[in-house]
Amino acid sequence: MPIVGNAGAGSVGAKPGSWLPEWKRIVVLLGSWTLGVRENEKGSGSRLIKWNGSGSREQKICKTTLPLFQACIKHLNSRDLLSTKVLTLALYKYILRAPQTAPHPPAAPPRTEVASSTAGRASRTKSASSTGRVSRANPASFHRPRLLRQAGLHLRRPRLSRQAGLRCHRLHLSAPSRSPTPPPNAVAPSSCSRLPRARLAIRGRRASSHSATVDTACSRRHSCDCLNRHRHLAVVATSAVAATTVAVPTACLCCGQIPLGRHRHNQAVTGRDLTVAALVLLAEVARETTGYSNGAPDPAAVVAISCCRPGSIPPSTAAAGSCRRHPAAVTARWPLAGGARSGRRDNPRRQGTGATRTGISKTYVSSVVAKTLALQELKGNIRVFCRVRPLLPNESGAVAYPKSGENLGRGIELTHNGQMYFFTFDKVFEQSTSQEDVFIEISHLVQSALDGYKVCIFAYGQTGSGKTYTMMGNPELHDQKGLIPRSLEQIFQTSQALISQGWKYKMQASMLEIYNEAICDLLATNHTTIQDGGASKYSIKHDANGNTHVSDLIIVDVLSINEVSSLLKRAAQSRSVGRTQMNEESSRSHCVFTLRFFGVNEGTDQQVQGVLNLIDLAGSERLNKSGATGDRLKETQAINKSLSCLSDVIFSIAKKEEHVPFRNSKLTYLLQPCLGGDSKTLMFVNLSPEVSSTGESICSLRFAARVNSCEIGIPRRQTQVRSLAQG
């Protein structure tokens, strides 16, 4: 792993004792080389001694910069968790640094700053007496590519900086002593195996342009998975100064890559030249941005605002952040370090040392909350999670997963007939993933139903791939509970906790199945299936607000989790299940569980209406494999037809056709608000890892990739203020 320091750039092959210009010295320690420091006899400098097994080489280093390099090496040696890519980038930026003599830092500075500047600045020369910088003699000899090759690095200058129009990028590697102190009961960030702590500051081309600084940290080992192509901590926020969106792209700390993007800020709206806009979410803004409206703390991932303009920022701006999985562990409060002062709105270049800059306090980012922000950033795309069931004892697997890089936790590979197929989704769960870990990824989506959103989660895949286990599981065993019972437990726990904040909820549950293109009520006491000669009397209707109603369907008011659990148990006994050659207990129908919320805040008279749809689709299967005959053959044909209609709908939405054939089947017509409305929709694609099912798995993954590309519109919250007549 490379370590950043300072030595002669032309030291390779240089004579011992040769003095190189200060601006041409770098320190590179690669591989297993060890660093030693020996003071010069005259006390004017030091020599770096590097051993590589075959001998040693001495490199001259300036005495004034020695403490900084010692602290850097000491710090980086203790931070073995840092990604090689991050360190390589840091070393590269240090080589491109403007030549200057570093001041005397403390003996062990808490943070090492690695900076870079453009080559244009290197062409300017100033006297050392007036500026404190060393004169840059013969700047043409400063050949960066040669320095990189001598350093053992073979990389190009990042094109990202030119694309972003940025002049300076600073990468701060925070030392453990200066890192945010974890709240009680939180796992130390240093114990995380994949997520180091880092800080990325992006500064614009001009002094009056905008900058952003975001501190990041990991609180739990399980919560550092990459999301949405290097957007693990990419935050789209609303400014507290004015209602202006500011995009702050940051480093993906799981893989170390830094996707720098354009930093946009609408000056026409604010009327201010913000130099620093490292804000993210205030509590009141988070309600509309992330869908959390039921009291504080709202899920504010980073709360820090700084501006070069005096009087722009309130002095006590602060907010709290919470993690839905470990609320006690990562809930914290981060006030700004220092308040804003009133003053003139002059150009920062003319303000000089008198310019007031509000300091940014320590910010503690919960990765779980960052995932919620990434979830809201998708502009209405259907989220797709992939889950692979475990292998049975007599099966051989054909599924692999990336072990590193940007697709870690998001990619899946299948080999079929000697050809490899690779797919990426928002999340991929391996065979060993537990039910609890799966639910954690969708818990925020379930929570948003209480805030007045329409939420739909459905499972898709071939028969025997684990759809019913994912959605329902075994409610009798805690570790095997599926998404439906876990979602209900969370909803009732949250609704009870919100009573103290003035919220009261009314909940109604219903459950139906679509069997052979006919709707059956699973909560009816005299349940009669189509195979017993019963006739379907239920019809689907959609109102003007996009809500779905099924005529004559039994809707039960539920007051506790026990009541809902008994309803689920009764519905499971009524569902159509059959045995095929591919599955001993194959679901022969599409099952839809619906929970409606009606909430009122007695203090603010605010009303919300939310809907949670949890759907377990029947599995697709090939007739030659299932061996279906008689009723099973008819069921298989009906299942495949409805899933084919679902595929037609998805293709029409993806192509943005004017007509979408929702009415071609009962399933697609029932899902119309979820697929073509303002709902938050998530699809699970379940796979069987065995070799014999690879063909069906590839078909499912292709369909899931098409679903993931569909834009169904931005989710809309159903809320209003209660009138006096209603009260």
Curated annotation (Swiss-Prot):
Presence of keyword Nucleotide-binding: yes
Positions annotated to bind ATP: 461-468
Molecular functions per Gene Ontology: ATP binding; ATP hydrolysis activity; microtubule binding; microtubule motor activity
A cellular component annotation (GO) from this entry: cytoplasm
Domain Kinesin motor: 381-710
CDD domains xrefs: KISc_C_terminal
Keyword Nucleotide-binding included in the entry's annotation: yes
UniProt-listed GO biological process terms: microtubule-based movement; spindle assembly
Domain of life: Eukaryota
Region listing for Disordered, in residue ranges: 100-156, 172-194, 336-357
Pfam families assigned: Kinesin
UniProt cross-references to InterPro entries, sorted A to Z: Kinesin-like_fam, Kinesin_motor_CS, Kinesin_motor_dom, Kinesin_motor_dom_sf, P-loop_NTPase
Record keywords, A-Z: ATP-binding, Microtubule, Motor protein, Nucleotide-binding
Residue ranges with Polar residues bias: 114-133
Family under the similarity heading: Belongs to the TRAFAC class myosin-kinesin ATPase superfamily. Kinesin family. KIN-14 subfamily.
Protein name, UniProt field: Kinesin-like protein KIN-14G
Species, as recorded: Oryza sativa subsp. japonica
The organism's taxonomic lineage, starting at the top: Eukaryota, Viridiplantae, Streptophyta, Embryophyta, Tracheophyta
